[in-house]
Amino acid sequence: MADDWDLHAVVRGCSAVSSSATTTVYSPGVSSHTNPIFTVGRQSNAVSFGEIRDLYTPFTQESVVSSFSCINYPEEPRKPQNQKRPLSLSASSGSVTSKPSGSNTSRSKRRKIQHKKVCHVAAEALNSDVWAWRKYGQKPIKGSPYPRGYYRCSTSKGCLARKQVERNRSDPKMFIVTYTAEHNHPAPTHRNSLAGSTRQKPSDQQTSKSPTTTIATYSSSPVTSADEFVLPVEDHLAVGDLDGEEDLLSLSDTVVSDDFFDGLEEFAAGDSFSGNSAPASFDLSWVVNSAATTTGGI
């Protein structure tokens, strides 16, 4: 025993104690597979760890969802940015469309300038134009006493041909005719049948005058016949009015017999009339005939 208490023995004892301690600590883990007591504890530890894991998983899912929601939040304000882009595209497209419109206007102006034609025509040659025109407006010109007339082609509705006619200031016998655009149809063959022609106006005036002349002729003939018929009756009544104005003879109201007229003829044949009475050449045949007609009508 004394030999065992040297330095080497102490070192050996310490190493043995440490090895034994390690073996004792590790041994329950090895024997836990066979010992049911330790197995129950391991199962309870496993169950508790699973429960803790189950309790922890919702928080992890919520954290994941919240992380995704945080990622989605900046995406929402991006939507109006996407909506603004079509507006910019529409604005850019509008600018693009506006460019050809300006080019079209410039082209149309160029076309008008190219198709414009100015001619100096005498007053006598204005009616010799091959095309048919209709006047649709008139406008005064500054510094000129003569107005300017505007004409369009009357042959076709879709024709864009126009004409401007104005009298020359320096030479009033000359006219300045400006043609714009071109005709899209052939020249008309019959000018009399065109709308807006002034050749038919005299015929219309003649037709308008003819009813008045016929009415005048019809109205004049009955008046003259009535005058010729009425005037002799007035003369005869004035001659037969011997007693006064109250005893006028009315053939329509009285019935006269034939003996009365025979007595009148004998009375007219004698010389019993004075100087103020009717002459001997007075003929009562007209009165007799008229009285006969009235009696026959009654």
Curated annotation (Swiss-Prot):
Inducing or repressing factors: Induced after flagellin treatment.
Coiled coil feature spans: none
DNA-binding region, residue range(s): 122-188
Subcellular location field: Nucleus
Transcription regulation among keywords: yes
Biased composition (Low complexity): 88-103
Entry-linked SMART domains: WRKY
Keywords from the named record: Activator, DNA-binding, Nucleus, Plant defense, Transcription, Transcription regulation
Pfam family of the protein (one): WRKY
Ranges of compositional bias, category Basic residues: 107-116
Primary localisation category: nucleus
GO biological process: cellular response to hypoxia; defense response; leaf senescence
Annotated region (Disordered), positions in chain: 75-116, 181-220
Single GO cellular component term: nucleus
Extent of Polar residues compositional bias: 190-220
GO function term, MF aspect, one: transcription cis-regulatory region binding
Domain of life: Eukaryota
UniProt-listed PROSITE patterns: WRKY
Entry's family note: Belongs to the WRKY group II-e family.
Stated role: Transcription factor involved in the expression of defense genes in innate immune response of plants. Interacts specifically with the W box (5'-(T)TGAC[CT]-3'), a frequently occurring elicitor-responsive cis-acting element. Activates WRKY 29, SIRK and its own promoters.
Additional facts recorded: Acts downstream a MAPK cascade and therefore might be regulated by phosphorylation. WRKY 22 and WRKY 29 may provide redundant functions.
Protein name, entry field: WRKY transcription factor 22
Provenance organism: Arabidopsis thaliana (Mouse-ear cress)
Organism lineage: Eukaryota, Viridiplantae, Streptophyta, Embryophyta, Tracheophyta
Gene: WRKY22
